[in-house]
Design a protein with these regions (language model features):
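Short, Lys/Arg-rich flexible segments
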Residues: 1-94, 100-168
Length: 168
């Protein structure tokens, strides 16, 4: 599966000044807000049903959600925010050791991985799921905050581009 991305290169006019630090701060703010909202979705202290957001028992999933704004290098400006459970080099997260738990929540687990006499799906009754798939809370967070993110980023880009002062 390939990921699509958009890259725009432009020459900066000599009479304009671009404040990169302000835009990077905007990405940090975006990452913090998305992390906060994703954590709130998995903080409900109730047993979750199939299709709902995961319930909160130990809090490990909620604490593992973090964000990362990569450092700028000579090849990349660092204008990006990654928000995910178990985010490597993430800010404000504690990693989950062992198997990747959010994948079990998203895909679910079928009952009876070992084949026995009655190995057919739901042969003993029930749905055939040991853990039915839950809602993808990260996608829900991104969709909920997409208009705010677009507005906030456009505002910060507008504020970061200033005309250069002319010396008389």
């Amino acid at each position: 599966m390939t990921t699509s991305f958009l890259h725009v290169d432009f020459q900066q006019p000599a009479e304009m000044r671009f404040n990169r630090a302000r835009v990077r701060r905007a990405f940090v703010t975006i990452g913090q807000r998305h992390m906060r909202d994703a954590r709130r979705l998995v903080m409900r202290r109730a047993r979750s049903a199939p299709g709902e957001n995961p319930g909160y028992q130990t809090g490990r999933l909620a604490r593992s959600i973090g964000y990362m704004v990569p450092r700028a290098s000579k090849h990349r400006p660092g204008f990006m925010a990654r928000i995910a459970p178990n985010q490597r080099n993430g800010e404000g997260n504690r990693r989950i050791t062992g198997d990747f738990y959010p994948a079990f929540l998203f895909y679910g687990v079928r009952r009876g991985a070992k084949r026995r006499r009655s190995h057919h799906r739901g042969a003993s009754g029930g749905s055939g799921w040991r853990l039915a798939p839950r809602n993808n809370f990260m996608v829900e967070t991104l969709e909920k905050n997409s208009s705010w993110t677009r507005y906030f980023l456009a505002r910060e880009l507008r504020k970061s581009l200033k005309p250069e002062r002319r010396h008389r």
